[in-house]
């Protein structure tokens, strides 16, 4: 019974145990099903993530995983163990339990990550790792690779798989930028873009897992090799980079930070684009433009700096700058601070290679295509892939880049071995780069095995700072509308920040003064560049003491205001000035709104607040002082940099203003010069010069209204009332001038004639002296020249005065009609001019400019043969024989005609009378007068007559009219006074051309009646004897004498006539002067019916014409022919226009300009013609 009872009890216990075991098994099955379901879900997630990462190879991975799972299930043997458990005893149950535990251990050992159920390595749909909370236990941080636009990049190793990858640590505060970068990395699946493995949060930072490129960046390769790349290497790198850019641009993504530091290369020589921290995903795919100012200054496109809308063509510009960087190891403008470089990029021409001749044309063209300021002209990425510089390279990337990669790897390994902290374990630090090197990190979690990461990063920063001038701004700048990272925000400047924007740099090496690691400082980009250029922050006490006086002076005064005062910067700097510096040491640059005057007051107040807070926090006092000193030092550097920028801008502005001012001054000066250029003299004035200069005569006009009237060069005659000044021709050197004084105003209204004739050395019986220079001229002192006495002026008749006045009155009236009549155009070139031919040694000084101008003109012989014939009445007169050759000078020396009548008071005029009446009428014919007398008159109320070195004669009263001599059977002699002055009248040619025309009516003498035009009477036969009122003998001057057998002048001048006329009365020895015929036995030159006859002086170089001396005079025809004497100066012929002319005879110049002589002689080789009467008055 006891045994049964025992057996029953045992059986009942075993049943209970079985029930319990069954219950446990059921529970275990439920758990297993749940785990399987969870595992399937996780496996699907893994498969999907692997499909995204791996791509087309995900199908094979799925099959392999399925096979591995089946094998694991077979090894577990869960179903058989369960069946055995149902029919086994307690021992069997214990065996099952043991086996079950062993199976669980086998599961954990055999199924590797990420396929086990322990969730060792897992990522979700957002590529977030969910397997473990502490990524430090999964990854081993090896070294720091570099810093990006928002964080630091490390080289890491996955502990379970030894897979090498790159981890980018970014502060979680920058959530917007992180989301942008992650979203872009998720979408980018290209061979030339770094792969994205996922992300996970570690402390206050976010870790982004990316593909690792063993050869690092192109920038690292340039620094390691210390040499630039070859054109083949550049071609391969650019080709692959353009493929990556094309993929991004197709996805409507702008990288915005293309540079050598962001182009990576792996061991297989595959180029990959990295660092999408500032990349932009354009929402508007149609427009495809952005406007945010981001990027690295030296690589920024001009449209980004100008804050204009831009598209993906900005990456093409950056790629062109990168090509220059690879070819020359540095980008353009790398030696300049970033702010100055950003000012120069939009304003300077596009950058090129510094030595383009050292590189091929294809590379220069590629850079030129990329770096075009107009974005529309830049080619796209797909177009650049067809550029000859990229197409001509046939080599594979491995062949070209593999040697470079191996060299870089060797040098990097060697550099690691030589580093001092290579084998020493560094102190525990966090793998972030948020604190400066000398700042302690309180309350920071410690990575177990990842120690010394920050020290390595700091050492790397030091090496980077030493290799390049960090003012080249290799860091990426971001212009933001607001800071967003300031915790206090007490000194927010309002809405003006958005308009101007603040250029900031995400510098992970600085934290705020309170020492809290979660508050990230944002400082201006150029301050960060200056900070890097100056090395580490000043930590020594001596340097702090040196900076303290600077800091105090900056706090007491406005730094920007001092800059404005020193450089006189425009007031608009307030709109661009510094707004404030908040308590987080964030320097905001932009418009400060209404707080412009309080910009730096806020800065000083904030510094004071910081100092108060530091006094309360003893642990952080040193840190705040260091930061304050750092800021003050940086502000001082900013001041210097702003001064340099301002000076450069002011230099450019001043140079531009100077060039504009020079252009304006040149324009004004040219206008003044053009306005002051003397107008070209008209034809009448030139004829005046030609006539006077060829004859080498001296004109002595009287200035009637002004003593300082300008010379001919300064005022050319433009009206009939203007008077021209005649300059003289002198031999070299010129003699001392004879200066005659001006008349007093009381005598200016009286017309005065000054007659000067050539005389022999014998004294004249006249007691009247020559005019003496008594009153001074305005320009020079007076001086006289001793000359022989000549007949007095008192013996001269008033007809001479009247004729001279009339000649002056009619001058420019004829000048105004020069271009009216073609038949009279040649005759109009001869002005009436009364000139003197004194000795060349005593002639007054005259300017040489007109002499050179008019004496060098070639003759115009065409006027000779084209002159119109005289009236028909005189055309039938036989020509006068002449044996003298044609003189080009005399043919040139012609003055403008004065169309005045030669008959007055119903009687024929003598040579002097015809001269007196020659200018009373404009359109009547006049006589040609050639005398040795200089006659100058002044009109009443007319334009003043001025001549350089003018001689001023005495005024004479008007004499009575000359009576007619009716007793002469052959040829009526001129009146006695005219006889007396006949030889002196020979110099009286061309008076009117000497002085510009005056008023016709106002200048006429009261005693001079109007000249009536009438036909002159026929001439009687020539007279045999000539008497003169003066006893001075007449010496033969030249062999040019008239033939006694030719009493008439030929109707027109021809070459034959001139040659015949050149033989008239050579070497006349008669010593008496006759006013009736004027020959006096002297050689006579005939001039045919032109308005005026100039005195012709034969120069010393001209040959003397030989002939016979004839003692009896010739009776000349009224139509006398001009005989031209040889001269050294060119001349022009003259045309007849009047029926009468006055013959001229050569006379010699004398020194006395005021006396009258009745004889003509030859002195030396100078010969002057003397005028003779051409007809006798008819009874």
UniProtKB/Swiss-Prot annotation:
PANTHER family noted in UniProt: SERINE_THREONINE-PROTEIN KINASE PAKE-RELATED (PTHR48012:SF28), STERILE20-LIKE KINASE, ISOFORM B-RELATED (PTHR48012)
Reaction(s) this enzyme catalyzes, per UniProt: L-seryl-[protein] + ATP = O-phospho-L-seryl-[protein] + ADP + H(+); L-threonyl-[protein] + ATP = O-phospho-L-threonyl-[protein] + ADP + H(+)
The protein's required cofactors: Mg(2+)
Intrachain S-S bonds: none
Binding site for ATP: 145-153, 168
A GO CC annotation given for this chain: cytoplasm
Record domain Protein kinase: where: 139-390
EC number assigned by the record: 2.7.11.1
Family: Belongs to the protein kinase superfamily. STE Ser/Thr protein kinase family. STE20 subfamily.
Pfam family, one: Pkinase
Source organism per UniProt: Dictyostelium discoideum (Social amoeba)
Protein known as: Serine/threonine-protein kinase pakG
Domain of life: Eukaryota
Low complexity composition bias: residue spans: 705-723, 743-761, 777-788, 812-833, 864-891, 964-997, 1024-1046, 1053-1077, 1137-1158
Region: Disordered, residue numbers: 414-469, 589-631, 705-1086, 1121-1179
Coiled-coil blocks: 12-53, 621-668
Compositionally biased tracts (Pro residues): 762-776, 954-963
Gene: pakG
Class of enzymatic activity (EC top level): transferase
């Amino acid at each position: 019974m006891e045994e049964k009872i025992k057996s029953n009890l045992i059986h009942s216990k075993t049943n209970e145990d079985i029930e319990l075991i069954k219950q446990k098994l059921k529970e275990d099955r439920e758990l297993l099903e749940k785990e399987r379901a969870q595992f399937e879900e996780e496996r699907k997630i893994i498969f999907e993530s692997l499909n995204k990462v791996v791509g087309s190879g995900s199908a094979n991975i799925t099959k392999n995983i399925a096979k591995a799972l089946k094998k694991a299930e077979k090894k577990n043997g869960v179903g058989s163990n369960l069946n055995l458990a149902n029919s086994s005893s307690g021992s069997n149950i214990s065996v099952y339990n043991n086996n079950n535990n062993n199976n669980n251990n086998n599961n954990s050992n055999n199924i590797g990550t990420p396929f086990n159920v322990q969730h060792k390595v897992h990522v979700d749909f957002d590529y977030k790792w969910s397997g473990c909370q502490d990524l430090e236990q999964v990854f081993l941080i090896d070294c720091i690779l570099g810093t990006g636009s928002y964080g630091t990049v490390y080289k890491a190793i996955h502990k379970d798989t030894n897979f090498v990858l790159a981890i980018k640590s970014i502060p979680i505060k920058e959530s917007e930028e992180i989301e942008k970068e992650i979203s872009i990395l998720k979408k980018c699946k290209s061979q030339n873009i770094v792969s994205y493995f996922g992300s996970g949060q570690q402390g206050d930072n976010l870790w982004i897992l990316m593909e690792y490129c063993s050869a690092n960046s192109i920038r690292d390769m340039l620094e390691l090799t210390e040499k630039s790349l070859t054109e083949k290497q550049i071609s391969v790198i650019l080709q692959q980079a353009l493929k990556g850019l094309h993929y991004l641009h197709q996805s409507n993504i702008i990288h915005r930070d293309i540079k050598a530091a962001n182009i990576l290369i792996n061991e297989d020589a595959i180029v990959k684009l990295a660092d999408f921290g500032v990349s932009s995903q354009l929402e508007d795919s149609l427009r495809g433009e952005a406007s945010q100012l981001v990027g690295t200054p030296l690589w920024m496109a001009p449209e980004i700096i100008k804050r204009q809308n831009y598209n993906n063509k900005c990456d093409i510009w950056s790629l062109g700058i990168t090509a220059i960087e690879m070819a020359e190891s540095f980008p353009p403008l790398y030696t300049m601070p970033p702010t100055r470089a950003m000012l120069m990029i939009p304003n300077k021409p596009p950058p090129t290679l510094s030595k383009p001749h050292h590189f091929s044309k294809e590379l220069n063209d590629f850079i030129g295509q990329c770096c075009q300021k107009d974005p529309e002209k830049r080619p796209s990425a797909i177009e650049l892939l067809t550029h000859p510089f990229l197409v001509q390279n046939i080599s594979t990337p491995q062949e070209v880049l593999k040697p470079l990669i191996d060299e870089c790897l060797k040098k990097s390994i060697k550099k690691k071995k030589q580093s001092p902290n290579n084998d020493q374990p560094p102190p525990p630090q966090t793998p972030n780069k948020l604190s400066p090197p000398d700042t302690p990190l309180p309350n920071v979690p410690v990575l177990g095995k990842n120690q010394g990461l920050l020290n390595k990063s700091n050492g790397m920063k030091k090496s980077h700072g030493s290799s390049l001038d960090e003012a080249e701004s290799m860091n990426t700048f971001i212009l933001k509308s607001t800071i967003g990272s300031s915790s206090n925000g007490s000194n927010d400047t309002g809405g003006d920040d958005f308009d101007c924007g603040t250029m900031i740099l995400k510098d992970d090496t600085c934290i705020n003064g309170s020492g809290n690691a979660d508050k990230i400082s944002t400082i201006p980009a150029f301050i960060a560049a200056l900070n890097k250029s100056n090395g580490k922050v000043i930590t020594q006490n001596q340097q702090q003491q040196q900076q303290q006086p600077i800091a105090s002076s900056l706090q007491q005064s406005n730094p920007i205001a001092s800059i404005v005062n020193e450089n006189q910067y425009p007031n608009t700097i307030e709109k661009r000035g510094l707004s404030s510096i908040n308590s987080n040491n964030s320097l905001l640059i932009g418009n400060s709104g209404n707080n412009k005057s309080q910009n730096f007051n806020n800065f000083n107040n904030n510094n004071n607040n910081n100092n108060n807070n530091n006094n309360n926090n003893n642990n952080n006092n040193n840190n705040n002082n260091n930061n304050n000193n750092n800021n003050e030092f940086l502000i001082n550097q900013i001041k210097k940099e702003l001064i340099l920028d301002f000076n450069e801008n002011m230099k450019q502005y001043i140079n531009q203003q100077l060039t504009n001012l020079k252009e304006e001054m040149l324009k004004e000066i040219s206008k003044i010069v053009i306005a002051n250029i003397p107008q070209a003299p008209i034809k009448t004035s030139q004829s005046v010069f030609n006539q006077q200069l060829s004859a080498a005569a001296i004109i002595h006009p009287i200035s009637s209204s002004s003593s300082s009237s300008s010379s001919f060069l300064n005022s050319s005659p433009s009206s009939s009332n203007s008077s021209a000044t005649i300059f003289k021709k002198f031999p070299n050197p010129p003699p001392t001038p004879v200066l005659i004084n001006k008349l007093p105003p009381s005598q200016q209204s009286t017309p005065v004639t000054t007659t000067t004739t050539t005389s022999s050395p014998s004294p004249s019986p006249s007691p009247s002296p020559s005019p003496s220079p008594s009153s001074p001229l305005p320009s020079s002192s007076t001086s006289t020249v001793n000359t022989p006495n000549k007949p007095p002026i008192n013996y001269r008749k008033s007809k001479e005065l009247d004729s001279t006045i009339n000649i002056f009155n009619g001058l420019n009236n004829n000048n105004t009609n020069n271009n009216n009549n073609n038949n009279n155009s040649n005759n109009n070139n001869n002005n009436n001019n009364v000139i003197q031919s004194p000795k060349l040694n005593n002639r007054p000084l005259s300017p040489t400019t007109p002499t050179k101008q008019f004496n060098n003109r070639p003759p115009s012989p065409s006027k000779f043969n084209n002159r119109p014939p005289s009236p028909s009445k005189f055309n039938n007169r036989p020509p006068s024989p002449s044996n003298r050759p044609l003189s080009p000078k005399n043919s040139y020396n012609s003055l403008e005609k004065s169309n005045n009548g030669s008959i007055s008071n119903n009687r024929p005029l003598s040579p002097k009378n015809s001269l007196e009446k020659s200018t009373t009428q404009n359109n009547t014919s006049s006589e040609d007068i050639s005398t040795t007398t200089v006659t100058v008159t002044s009109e009443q109320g007319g334009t003043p007559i001025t001549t350089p070195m003018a001689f001023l004669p005495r005024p004479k009263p008007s004499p009575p009219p000359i009576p007619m001599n009716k007793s002469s059977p052959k040829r009526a002699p001129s009146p006695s006074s005219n006889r007396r002055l006949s030889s002196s009248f020979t110099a009286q040619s061309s008076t009117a051309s000497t002085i510009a025309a005056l008023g016709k009516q106002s200048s006429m003498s009261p005693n001079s009646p109007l000249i009536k035009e009438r036909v002159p009477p026929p001439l009687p036969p020539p007279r045999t004897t000539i008497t003169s009122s003066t006893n001075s003998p007449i010496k033969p001057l030249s062999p040019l004498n008239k033939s006694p057998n030719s009493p008439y002048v030929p109707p027109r001048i021809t070459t034959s006539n001139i040659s015949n006329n050149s033989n008239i009365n050579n070497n006349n020895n008669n010593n008496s002067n006759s006013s009736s015929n004027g020959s006096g036995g002297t050689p006579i030159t005939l001039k045919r019916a032109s308005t005026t006859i100039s005195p012709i002086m034969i120069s010393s170089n001209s040959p003397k014409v030989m002939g016979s001396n004839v003692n009896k005079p010739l009776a000349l025809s009224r139509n006398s022919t001009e005989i031209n004497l040889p001269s050294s100066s060119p001349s022009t012929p003259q045309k007849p226009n009047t029926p009468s002319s006055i013959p001229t005879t050569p006379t010699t110049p004398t020194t006395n300009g005021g006396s009258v002589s009745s004889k003509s002689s030859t002195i030396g080789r100078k010969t002057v013609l003397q005028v003779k009467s051409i007809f006798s008055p008819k009874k």
